[in-house]
Amino acid sequence: MDKLVIKGGVPLEGTIRVSGSKNASLPILMASILLDEPVIYRNVPRLRDIHTTNKLLGILGCPAEFQGDAVHVRPCDLNPEAPYELVKTMRASVLCLGPLLARLGEARVAYPGGCAIGARPVDLHLSALEKMGAEFELDSGYIVGRCRQLQGAHIRFDFPTVGGTENLLMAATLAKGETILENAAREPEVIDLADFLCACGADITGQGTDVIRIRGVERLHGCEYRIMPDRIEAGTFMVAAGITRGNLLIEDCPDDALDAVSQKLRDMGLHVSREEGGTRVRYQGHLESTDIVTHPYPGFPTDMQAQFMALMCVADGFGMVEETIFENRFMHVLELVRMGADVRLVGRTARVRGGRQLRGAPVMASDLRASASLVLAGLAAQGETHVQRIYHLDRGYESIEEKLCPVGADIRRVPE
């Protein structure tokens, strides 16, 4: 197992490129199950979760392999069972449920695992699929689903669930009749999935709004598709520029998907602008804290909450962070406190007293975004920080040390 050793206090300057989106790649790769022809995905990040998904697709009958930055998938003899050995490591594996039911009329998917940052129940997925004619039972830790043919339905989500919207979006493409999804998630990754499905012959309208209409088609064909850039990686690099008092040009930055993040950075005193070649984020001599409340898109993303808390620790003044999406998403707080941060928790709210000089310390990552927060804190801290359990980080960031070192970071990966 590896750890990152970071010597902080160096402003980051230069150009850094954003990889393809993990959260767009996972459902789009799962959508391969719906196709009856080969497909090529470009701009796919080389991450642990992507490699796990490729292995899972192979077991399900869709052999997938990297060729350069592209993943080639060849759907062939489909298998309805997603085994526990792979599913236990990644919650997104439940996204194969809808496509399997749509193609085979059956699915046997182990109950999902992944980051321990909240319940993230799959009941929203199951109850919606039941309205389309599926039946489910839990058998020895597996979700077992069956149907003759999925039927179009009018479905309203109690909460704009991203995974639920994606699962139903995929299932409905091959269903009989029209499916309407109300209170659907509006995230850019949902739009990317819908755009991919349309490129394969699906009939979908309304993506990006809270009402999506899908008219089922007989089949979906293959295509070549480029995955959108990763808005959370881009946001993390934007915070890195601020927390190190640096100046970064971020290439392939999906600006339109980061309005809430960019505005909060401006509120804190950073220069953020679009220019030829990317998005510029520059420290302007002062950082002032702010308040953050996480919301579904287009609100402030929960996946950027931990990174902003690290930034608020070194900014002047007091700030509040309220987490409304997931419970248990403040596990990075105790590690930041070990580095000298002043953060107090009350329920789902964190009160951050800024203006602190963080100091290097051994810290332990508890989930993907918490690990990013600790890396950012290490970049700003005096002395040396050791971030342990970085397998969480590798699930969502493509060789982060190889991207940060060329812009001035002193960060290296070593065995524990």
From Swiss-Prot:
Q: One of this protein's GO BP terms?
A: regulation of cell shape
> Recorded GO terms, molecular function?
UDP-N-acetylglucosamine 1-carboxyvinyltransferase activity
Tell me if Heme is a UniProt keyword of this record: no
Q: At which residues is 2-(S-cysteinyl)pyruvic acid O-phosphothioketal found?
A: 115
Record's CDD domains? UdpNAET
**What Enzyme Commission number(s) appear in the record?**
2.5.1.7
Pfam families in alphabetical order: EPSP_synthase (PF00275)
Keyword list (alphabetical) reads: Cell cycle, Cell division, Cell shape, Cell wall biogenesis/degradation, Cytoplasm, Peptidoglycan synthesis, Pyruvate, Transferase
Q: Which residues are noted in the entry as UDP-N-acetyl-alpha-D-glucosamine-binding?
A: 91, 120-124, 303, 325
Q: Does the keyword ATP-binding apply?
A: no
List the catalytic residues. 115
Principal localisation: cytoplasm
Enzyme class label: transferase
Q: Cellular component GO terms, alphabetically?
A: cytoplasm
Q: In which pathway does it act?
A: Cell wall biogenesis; peptidoglycan biosynthesis
Catalytic activity as recorded in UniProt:
phosphoenolpyruvate + UDP-N-acetyl-alpha-D-glucosamine = UDP-N-acetyl-3-O-(1-carboxyvinyl)-alpha-D-glucosamine + phosphate
Its subcellular locations are:
Cytoplasm
Annotated positions binding phosphoenolpyruvate = 22-23
Provide the function of this protein: Cell wall formation. Adds enolpyruvyl to UDP-N-acetylglucosamine.
This chain belongs to the protein called UDP-N-acetylglucosamine 1-carboxyvinyltransferase
Q: Which organism is it from?
A: Oleidesulfovibrio alaskensis (strain ATCC BAA-1058 / DSM 17464 / G20) (Desulfovibrio alaskensis)
